[in-house]
């Protein structure tokens, strides 16, 4: 008996991957093996960078807080130490938002940190 191959399922699987790689450059978009490898590698990059995004944003928030704190005559570390002593539990994301969009509120927070 000849070997039976489910061509419909194979073709559908390949089509699905090639659809996902639309927009890639060169052979990465239309050669099955290259496209499959590129797509799989893209998944690993996505997994890695979902974790890296968290540290990148934290670094950005710290830079923004530091810049705004120095305008008020304080360093970042002194500001964070003062906030801890004053018992103000406010995260870096909110502090960075205050520094960028609400400078008056940020000045009030810095004043409390200086007083502590």
UniProtKB/Swiss-Prot annotation:
CDD domains: Ribosomal_L20. GO terms for cellular component: cytosolic large ribosomal subunit. Gene3D superfamilies: 6.10.160.10, Ribosomal protein L20. InterPro entries: Ribosomal_bL20, RIBOSOMAL_L20_CS, Ribosomal_protein_bL20_C. Keywords: Ribonucleoprotein, Ribosomal protein, RNA-binding, rRNA-binding. GO terms for molecular function: rRNA binding; structural constituent of ribosome. The keyword DNA repair does not apply. It comes from the Bacteria. Pfam families: Ribosomal_L20 (PF00453). GO terms for biological process: ribosomal large subunit assembly; translation. Binds directly to 23S ribosomal RNA and is necessary for the in vitro assembly process of the 50S ribosomal subunit. It is not involved in the protein synthesizing functions of that subunit. Belongs to the bacterial ribosomal protein bL20 family. This is Large ribosomal subunit protein bL20. The gene is rplT.
């Amino acid at each position: 008996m000849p070997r039976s191959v489910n061509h419909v399922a194979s073709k559908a699987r390949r089509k699905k991957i090639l659809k996902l790689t639309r927009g890639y450059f060169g052979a990465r978009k239309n050669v099955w093996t290259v496209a499959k490898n590129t797509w799989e590698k893209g998944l690993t990059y996505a997994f890695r960078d979902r974790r890296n995004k968290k540290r990148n944003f934290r670094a950005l928030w710290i830079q923004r807080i530091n810049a705004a704190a120095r305008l008020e005559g304080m360093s970042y570390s002194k500001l964070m130490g003062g906030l801890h002593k004053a018992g103000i539990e406010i995260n870096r994301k909110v502090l960075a938002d205050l520094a960028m969009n609400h400078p008056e509120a940020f000045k009030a927070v810095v004043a409390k940190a200086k007083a502590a």
